[in-house]
Amino acid sequence: MHAHGALLELTIGRVVKAHGIGGEVVVEIRTDDPASRFCPGNILRAKDFPRGGPERRYTVVYAREHGARLLVRLAGVSDRDAADALRGSLFVIDSLDLPPIDEPDTYYDHQLEGLQVRTMMGRDVGVVAEVLHTAAGELLAVRCDSGEVLVPFVGAIVKLVSLDDGIVEIDPPKGLLDL
């Protein structure tokens, strides 16, 4: 489990490929706030994920929507070769740099991942492996002994989230936990 308040690196985008000849990169968005993360003047930390190179920093010149992705121009990346060299790189931020959430019962994904899941009757179900975002809402992918179970993250099922205790307590409908 992640220690409450522990520093984690969170990926906010991944460079998919170069775009055009002017140095733009196509970025797969992995943040719920791309407008503020990729706003002009922001400094992005880039991890050279596929090649294991050193972390580099880039200043955003501009970003614009490109379907479900962004086209991003970075200072110092002025041609296709320089942009293509970034392919596969991950833009990351530190979890402690995230603004606090003021809404009750709202969490960042990384806060839920690693929490123990149990029923209201005390039966251990497993550990939250991932939070999935679907058109129908959020699902907790819970890793358990018999595989994985998807638990809708809704008040009718998720009765308690305690970050301090590291638990998610659920009241599953009949059949939800049957694999």
UniProtKB/Swiss-Prot annotation:
Keywords: Chaperone, Cytoplasm, Ribosome biogenesis, rRNA processing. One of its GO terms (biological process) is rRNA processing. It is found in: Cytoplasm. The keyword Metal-binding does not apply. GO terms for cellular component: cytoplasm; ribosome. InterPro entries: PRC-brl_dom, PRC_barrel-like_sf, RimM, RimM_N, RimM_N_sf, Transl_B-barrel_sf. Its main location: cytoplasm. Residues 104-176 form the PRC barrel domain. It comes from the Bacteria. The keyword Zinc does not apply. GO terms for molecular function: ribosome binding. Pfam families: PRC (PF05239), RimM (PF01782). The PRC barrel domain binds ribosomal protein uS19. An accessory protein needed during the final step in the assembly of 30S ribosomal subunit, possibly for assembly of the head region. Essential for efficient processing of 16S rRNA. May be needed both before and after RbfA during the maturation of 16S rRNA. It has affinity for free ribosomal 30S subunits but not for 70S ribosomes. Belongs to the RimM family. Binds ribosomal protein uS19. This is Ribosome maturation factor RimM. The gene is rimM.
